[in-house]
Amino acid sequence: MIGIALLTLVPGELGGSESATRGLLQALARVGTLPYRVYLPPAAPDAHEGLPYDVLSDYRLAHSRLERLLALGLATARPEPLRRRLRSADVVHYPFTIRVPSVEAPTVVTLHDLQHLDLPQLFSRAERGFRSLYYNRSARAAERVVVPSAFVRASTVDRLGLDADRVRVIPHGIDHARFSPGDDEREPFLLYPARAWPHKNHARLYEALALLRRERPELRLVLTGGGQTESVPDGVEVRGHVSLDELVSLYRRASALVFPSRYEGFGQPVVEAMACGCPVACSDIPALVEVAGGAARTFAADDAEAIAAAVLDVLANAADYRERGLERAASFTWERAAAHYEDVYRELL
């Protein structure tokens, strides 16, 4: 039996890794061929996505980031009650990287990125220490490490010193039943769905928007994702957190997705936008170039003029970018990801 340990999940706090994990579980429930059991924390008793499950009441209830850290510390100090609950698993998978509880069975860890090592200046000393302790140690202890892109694989092998044969690339999928083209008219706005972390590069995007509006004064920029606390320039609309249905609607109505991030392990919004028929302009960082696969217009992330020029190119050639994007997005499915994960599990059985 394959155990999937989600004990460190606090719903709504883990961003893209939570969405990716739920997508994988849903696909395993639909098309999986192995027996599964999901081990859930009391804070997320419904996160099994249709697979058999146990809620481990021995794990401390956690509804916030601080409570999550406390629960993790207690589980690390006193792992035996949790280990007993997982003893029937032949292989244990930790989709949120941290091996809690540690077990004697072979383990698979999903490592979404190594941003704390690649861009350490963006993290506090405490956060760097936490990630180095739990992420690095968990990856080194696992029999297999799964990453979403070749970029993260190279970083993992280089920075953590792992044997390349232990690290497998399995790209994320998307729900094509939800992320699909609609009949909406395209409107004169650009979409950037990203929480306002420093590496998301909002300030440079604002500079590019000012340049764009000299030539296309009707253009607006719509932001989603939360975290926006500073004032924004004219032409910027801050939506904050939006529902999945609202996000799909925005993808279907936006003239283009613009994604100027300085760092990504995968870049899920790029694929989601393409699947909705939204043309994409994104930064030329390795993970986004890899994921876009030539179907997006790329630019240097810190060059406002280059961002503006890329957006104008996408707007002028929208039909071409739309078709290329739809073709590229079709290759990213959770069913394919689930099949590759099952290949990894079988290696350890």
What are these regions (language model features)?
Residues 1-349:
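Carbohydrate transferase catalytic cores enriched for Leloir-type hexosyltransferases
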